[in-house]
């Protein structure tokens, strides 16, 4: 009898342990499902839908948020380039050019970055894209044609929803891009000024710039770079990363321009005897 009672107690304990484990797993899986559902609903990286009208989105991660913006925002044109373009207000393009323009800047962007985002744009919008405003940075167009400035988050750049788990179950996405904006709405991004640099006219003025400016060391004439120093690398980038989109989309106007670098930048370029190479 005692032996049977002991067996029954052990079986009860096993059953209780199984129930507890099943309950824990159920709660755990329900929590994961809830987190995934919340991320899909708010979608702070815009992978599945347009922004919710009421949500105070924080848009400050170019590599991870630009792909969704390219896929799901409404626009006639795009603005691409480095951090120089991040200072632009896209309302200007609508006022002056009549184009609803989406900013898709990448700080320090290489031509491959521009190619990646243009591929997404044209795949998503096709001939709806009326204009591409592309800033050409002299210092980056000689980069390796297959290199991006920062590592690309592949699962955000493709259309495979089955590899999105790192996005859907991401602590930083949940805390920094959903809960924090809800708790403090003052950090919500202005859609016309996405990725706007932190400096303002109050701090970014002639006196402050000159206070911290240190001129580059001046080189001798014999150290000057040849005018065609960057030519081959730039041509390779144009052939691989830029011209294919221009040729494939005759319905789209491409406005290619040099962004307005500071005169101090050009002073450094001149002192380093690189002016002919940079503008060549």
Question: Where do the model's predicted regions map?
Answer:
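N-terminal Lys/Arg-rich, disordered targeting/topogenic segments
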Residues: 1-19
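Hydrophobic membrane-insertion alpha-helices, especially the h-region
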Residues: 22-41
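Alpha-helical transmembrane signal-anchor/signal-peptide segments
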Residues: 41-63
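Short extracytoplasmic
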Residues: 57-84
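Loop/turn elements at helix/coil->beta-strand transitions in domains of secreted/extracellular proteins
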Residues: 74-76, 99, 127-131, 249-254
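Membrane-embedded segments
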Residues: 84-165
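Secreted/periplasmic serine-hydrolase-like ester/acetyl group-modifying domain
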Residues: 135-136, 145, 149-253
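Substrate-gating cap/lid alpha-helix
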Residues: 265-280
């Amino acid at each position: 009898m005692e032996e049977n009672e002991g067996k029954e107690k052990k079986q009860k304990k096993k059953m209780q342990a199984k129930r507890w484990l099943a309950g824990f797993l159920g709660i755990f899986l329900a929590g994961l499902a809830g987190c995934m559902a919340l991320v899909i609903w708010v979608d702070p990286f815009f992978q599945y839908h347009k922004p919710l009208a009421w949500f105070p989105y924080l848009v400050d991660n170019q590599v991870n948020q630009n792909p969704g913006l390219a896929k799901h925002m409404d626009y006639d044109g795009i603005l691409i380039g480095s951090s120089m373009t991040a200072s632009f207000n896209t309302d200007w393009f609508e006022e002056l050019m009549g184009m609803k323009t989406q900013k898709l800047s990448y700080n320090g962007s290489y031509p491959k970055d521009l190619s990646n985002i243009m591929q997404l744009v044209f795949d998503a919008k096709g001939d709806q894209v009326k204009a591409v405003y592309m800033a050409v940075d002299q210092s980056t167009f000689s980069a390796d044609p297959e290199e991006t400035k920062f590592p690309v988050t592949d699962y955000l750049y493709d259309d495979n929803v089955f590899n999105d788990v790192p996005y859907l179950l991401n602590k930083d996405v949940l805390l920094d891009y959903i809960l924090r904006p809800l708790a403090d709405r003052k950090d919500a991004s202005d859609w016309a000024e996405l990725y706007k640099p932190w400096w303002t006219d109050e701090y970014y003025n002639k006196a402050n710039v000159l206070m911290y400016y240190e001129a580059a060391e001046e080189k001798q004439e014999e150290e000057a770079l040849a005018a065609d120093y960057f030519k081959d690398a730039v041509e390779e980038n144009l052939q691989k990363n830029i011209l294919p989109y221009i040729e494939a989309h005759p319905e789209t106007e491409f406005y290619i321009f040099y962004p307005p670098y500071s005169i101090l930048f050009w002073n450094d370029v001149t002192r380093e005897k690189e002016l002919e190479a940079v503008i060549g």
